[in-house]
């Protein structure tokens, strides 16, 4: 399995992450984009697909209602992320765990953003570009962390929890929290839970 992860956060609480996993043995790819704190929009914006065909070239994926590409401009220094998709807006993070998958308001989501390494070296850097949600375009310029296949996932972070998201995975979920720690906003990658009493397939 190979994976790439971009976390980003702006000081006002607008934040998100993008993850692409190539699961070669299963011949599928997993793709996630989650956004929180979007100006003038309540709740969590979700684009999640666990049944994407493996890319035919580079890191470009296509599925129904989804196109995304992660492009390496310079290894461990500069990446570009593009997305055109339809996602859903959830009123509450827990709505992601309902039987049958995420159910919410259908909404257009787009990304045209870049990550560039910072003075401290990877994975830390800066993210800038445009995030599109519905008919609105939001320019972002903030901190970002890019984890390529050679960089371990981020771990738990302690601090004031600003937002939480849940990502259904198999019979459980991954919990990610946006945390204010040491004056900065950071994404924490927390535990994977097994959700009891659920017989449906959350893939």
Label each residue range with its predicted role.
Residues 1-203:
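Structured soluble/peripheral alpha/beta segments that form catalytic or ligand/cofactor-binding pockets
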């Amino acid at each position: 399995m190979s994976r790439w992860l971009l976390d980003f956060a702006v000081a006002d609480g607008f934040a998100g992450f993008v993850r692409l996993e190539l699961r070669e043995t299963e011949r599928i790819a997993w793709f996630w984009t989650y956004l929180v704190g979007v100006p003038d929009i309540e709740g969590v914006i979700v684009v999640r697909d666990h049944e994407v065909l493996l890319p035919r070239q580079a890191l470009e994926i296509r599925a129904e209602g989804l196109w995304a590409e992660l492009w390496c401009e310079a290894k461990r220094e500069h990446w570009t992320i593009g997305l055109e998709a339809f996602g859903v807006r959830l009123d509450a993070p827990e709505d992601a765990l309902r039987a049958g998958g995420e159910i919410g308001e259908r909404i257009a989501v787009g990304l045209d953003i870049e990550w560039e390494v910072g003075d401290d070296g990877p994975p830390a850097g800066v993210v800038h570009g445009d995030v599109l949600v519905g008919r609105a375009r939001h320019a972002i310029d903030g901190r970002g962390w890019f984890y390529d296949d050679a960089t371990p996932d981020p771990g738990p972070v302690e601090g004031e929890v600003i937002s939480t998201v849940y990502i259904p995975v198999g019979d459980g979920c991954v919990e990610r929290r946006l945390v204010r720690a040491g004056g900065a906003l950071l994404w924490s990658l927390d535990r994977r839970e097994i959700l009891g009493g659920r017989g449906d397939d959350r893939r």
